[in-house]
Design a protein with these regions (language model features):
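Helicase motor core with emphasis on the C-terminal RecA-like subdomain
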Residues: 4, 8-51, 55-62, 68-163, ...
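Extended, highly charged accessory segments
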Residues: 231-234, 413, 455, 462-532, ...
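Short Cys/His-rich Zn2+-coordinating modules
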Residues: 660-671, 706-716, 806-812
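Short helix-coil boundary/hinge micro-motifs
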Residues: 670-682, 689
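Histidine-centered nuclease catalytic patch
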Residues: 687-728, 739
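The −1 position to Zn-ligating cysteines in a subset of zinc-ribbon hairpins
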Residues: 542, 682, 697, 729, ...
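Cys/His-coordinated zinc-binding microdomains
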Residues: 687, 734, 829-832
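Short metal-coordination and nucleic-acid-contact micro-motifs, chiefly zinc-binding Cys/His arrays
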Residues: 676-680, 722-726, 821
């Protein structure tokens, strides 16, 4: 059955109808053609005519004309609109007319490079031109690499290979860099956050090397490189700031082409919200089970379908569900495959070919297939969960109907706040994308890493800038103090014996890693940033790798090794940590009405103090364990909002919370005395000494009752009363803290909402942001929420949050008001029984009262 005939059945199905929150029909659109640009080599139109392309689409002609006129050009049109031809035409024109000219193509994934290789080779074959084209990445056989270095005129690679495998060895590529005429950068919306900040610095290094070989910088005069010979051709999905983003990446003006001339087929987009299985707790049926139910119907009816999952594990799980569902339906001739990172290259190529040829009917993929690899004409795309940005969602939806035919895209929401906001606010999705791609190439941690690489590649001249970074000389002095470079005359030379590119991953801000090793044999099974390791790799933790559970037996923090052993267990572990923020510098701050808001440089101090064992599926707490790890400090940028005293007093007067006295356990007197002695018998907030005849109070940083101590049943008081969780306060400061502490359920609910809604506006992943709730923050003296960039040094997210605060607060109130749960749930203020957030059963009411007071 065709999709055209299947959709009316879907519309009439009462079970599906009850789940649908939006059904949008996007009408078909005819093509808009243009004439071939006059300046284009006439051999190209003839070759394309032989392949059935008589005229270019309007955006292809416009982009070609701009590029041939010498403009760096950016094409921003939808998926499958022919962006490839828009950059291939000028590149082939230049290479046809200059036998020494070369072109570099950068793609974010290996699969995209392989896909474009075939497209270029087919066109060059029709042209009968001598233009060798090759892919050069980690999968390229070593036996072929010398031939590619010496002979390729078009090189297809990825930023990681350019960074570590090409630029440091530029002397072997001298002919290529001498003739470099064009740099193509596809899918630039992917280059955001930490990854994009790294890539911008890799491009700075590329410009230095091209300038060196092309003589763009006077070697004796030390003039700044002009790099006039290379034209940049860029392509992007729709984002809010394409020109700004492109110009930050290449540090040069770009000309924008955004009016799409390609035809589009009719597309139906369905938003589906799984039914509630527990209305009070706000729990919904798994979106994987929903995808299995409706996806199996599509496949059984002959609709070739791609399913997108958020992780490798959920992709494998959904693949199993679909195969089982088809078997229950008695459908045995439908082939469904998986596609994700970790599959061998030849296996991925075979799956792509099977999809193109129709031998494979369905594929379950991670975002590895989100980008423009040619997988043929799919009828439907099913998104199991929001991929993080509207741009990515449209990319995934665009995998169906790529050749202008009728298609379906179905978004099936998960139970989290981000998914629920999208599925309940379809206008937000279908309206203009609010997302900005943000990078910070001058993040000092990232920049210094690439400055080392650049110095290794070529000496710096006195007065030479590294891109638009204005303090290159000062940064080189810092490296000299570390013994990594030295100044001789007017040059700075690399003197270290290290290979700096090998120590820098483009996917993380910090080069410092923890290696994960099997206890038997010492085989490395993975690695992790040092910043994120403590809550996941502490001793006693259950670490999951490729769906397999490992017990962490030993963490050697100094050496950077975690030793693990495979185990079969029915529980997971969750770390218990204490964190606090120190504001190092305030860049902007406003105190108006109910809120003080600000942003600046912060230090986030964190220490993992314990963990709990949580049974899978039921989430029952099975027990606790202690951890002794050093404090970690993340220096980054943060945004904060703090409640005014009158807001706190009004909520306190409303009696929206209660506070029962605690039994602090048998070791409380001893631990209390130790804490007072450690703090010098002074209040840690105001510095006041203990008055005669009266002792100061001792406060639990993480509230005592969240540790689940039950006298006679467990000894969880030991974790709660560890000195790391205690601080000495005078009576006045303690009252202020406790006043804020009783608000903490509302504050935590609001922080959870802001943390989940912010990525929609920032075009980042929730994991790019961290957050803290402080009942009485030292830098504001008030109950405070802090959201911070998790990349060392920050990448610009906090500053944008400061500007977005009004919209975010309104969106948060709307979200919690509309949620149908009783007390709070993952779709609004977070799970009501989770760890430090479980300070009040009715966190939802507290959060809503707090938002109403703020926005009154």
């Amino acid at each position: 059955m065709s999709l055209v005939h299947l959709l009316p059945r879907f519309q009439a199905d009462p079970n599906l109808h009850a789940r649908i929150t939006a059904w949008e029909r996007i009408p078909a659109r005819p093509p808009v053609y243009a004439a071939w640009p006059d300046a284009l080599d006439p051999r190209l139109p003839l070759a394309l005519a032989a392949r059935g392309i008589a005229r270019p689409y309007s955006h292809q002609a416009q982009a070609t004309e701009l590029a041939l006129a010498g403009h760096h050009t950016l094409v921003v049109t939808p998926t499958a609109s022919g962006k490839t031809l828009a950059y291939n035409l000028p590149v082939l024109h230049w290479l046809l007319n200059d036998p020494d000219a070369r072109a570099l193509y950068l793609f974010p994934t290996k699969a995209l490079a392989q896909d474009q290789l075939q497209t270029l080779q087919d066109l060059i074959e029709v042209l009968q031109a001598d233009i060798p084209v090759a892919v050069y990445d980690g999968d390229t056989p070593k036996a072929h690499r010398k031939r590619i270095r010496e002979g390729a005129r078009i090189l297809l690679t990825n930023p990681d290979m350019l960074h570590a495998g090409i630029l440091p060895h530029h002397t072997a590529w001298n002919a290529f860099f001498r003739g470099l005429r064009a740099v193509v950068i596809d899918e630039i919306h992917i280059y955001r956050g930490v990854f994009g900040s790294h890539v911008a610095n890799v491009l700075r290094r590329l410009r230095r090397i091209a300038d060196f070989y092309q003589g763009a910088t006077g070697l004796e005069s030390g003039e700044r490189a002009s790099h006039l010979n290379v034209t940049y051709l860029l392509a992007s999905a729709t984002i809010a700031n394409p020109v700004e983003h492109a110009e930050r990446l290449i540090e040069a003006p770009v000309a924008l082409v955004a009016r799409n001339g390609a035809p589009t087929g009719e597309k139906h987009v369905i938003f589906l919200n799984p039914p509630l299985v527990d209305r009070d707790l706000g729990l919904r049926r798994s979106n994987l089970l929903e995808a299995q139910q409706w996806g199996a119907t599509l496949l059984a009816e002959g609709v070739q379908t791609i399913f997108f999952a958020r992780s490798r594990m959920t992709a494998e799980l959904l693949l199993t569900y679909l195969r089982e569902g088809l078997e229950r339906k008695g459908v045995r001739d439908v082939v469904v495959r998986g596609y994700r990172g970790g599959y061998l290259p030849r296996e991925r190529r075979a799956i792509e070919r099977g999809l193109r040829e129709g031998a494979i009917h369905g594929v379950v993929a991670t975002n590895a297939l989100e980008l423009g690899v040619d997988i043929g004409q799919l009828g439907a795309a099913v998104l199991t969960g929001f991929p993080g940005t509207i741009a990515s969602a449209w990319q995934q939806a665009g995998r169906a109907g790529r050749r202008g035919d009728f298609s379906l895209a179905m978004f099936i929401a998960g139970g989290g706040a981000l998914d629920q906001y999208i599925v309940q606010h379809p206008d937000f999705f279908f309206g203009r994308s609010p997302e900005h791609a943000r990078i910070n190439p001058d993040n000092l941690v990232i920049l210094l890493a690439h400055l080392r690489c650049a110095a290794f590649e070529l000496p710096f001249r006195t007065g030479e800038d590294f891109g638009r970074f204005q303090f290159t000389e000062e940064a080189l002095v810092m490296l000299a103090e570390e013994g990594e470079v030295m100044q001789a005359g007017d040059r700075w030379f690399w003197t270290s014996e290290s290979y700096p590119a090998g120590e820098v991953s483009l996917r993380t801000a910090s080069p410092d890693r923890i290696l994960i090793l099997e206890a038997d044999g010492g085989e490395t099974i993975g690695e992790m940033d040092r910043e994120t390791a403590p809550p996941l790799l502490h001793e006693g933790a259950i670490y999951l790798h490729e769906g397999r559970a490992y017990l962490v037996e030993h963490l050697d923090w100094e050496e950077g090794h975690a030793w693990v052993r495979p185990v079969e267990v029915d529980y997971a572990t969750r770390a218990i940590s204490a964190s606090q923020a120190d504001v190092l510098a305030v860049h902007d701050q406003k105190d108006a009405g109910p809120l003080l808001r600000g942003w600046g440089e912060v230090a986030i101090r964190s220490r993992v103090t314990g963990f709990k064992r949580v049974k899978r599926w039921t989430h029952e707490v099975l027990g606790y364990g202690e951890v002794d790890l050093p404090e970690t400090v993340l220096e980054t940028t943060g945004y904060w909002l703090a409640l005014a005293d009158d807001v706190v007093d009004a909520l306190r007067a409303a009696r929206l919370w209660t506070s029962a006295p605690n039994d602090y356990g048998p070791n409380w007197p001893e631990q209390r005395a130790k804490a007072r002695a450690r703090d010098g018998y002074r209040c840690v907030l105001c510095g006041a000494s203990e008055p005669p005849g009266r002792t100061h109070d001792v406060h639990h940083i993480r509230p005592f009752r969240t540790f689940g101590y039950i006298p006679g049943v467990n000894e969880n008081y030991r974790l709660a009363n560890r000195l790391e969780n205690l601080r000495t306060l005078c009576r006045t400061c303690h009252q202020k803290v406790e006043r804020g502490q009783r608000l903490r359920s509302g504050l935590s609910g609001l922080a959870y909402l802001l943390h989940n809604l912010a990525p929609l506006h920032l075009m980042c992943d929730p994991s790019d942001l961290g957050y803290l709730v402080e009942p009485l923050a030292p830098h504001t003296g008030r109950p405070t929420i802090i959201l911070y960039d998790r990349a060392p040094g920050g990448i610009g997210l906090s500053e944008r949050l400061y500007d977005l605060q009004p919209q975010l607060l309104e969106a948060a109130r709307e979200m919690v008001s509309a949620c149908g749960c009783s007390h709070g749930c993952p779709a609004c203020v977070g799970p009501v029984t989770e760890g430090a957030e479980a300070l009040d059963w009715d966190a939802k009411a507290l959060t809503l009262a707090l938002l109403n007071a703020i926005l009154a």
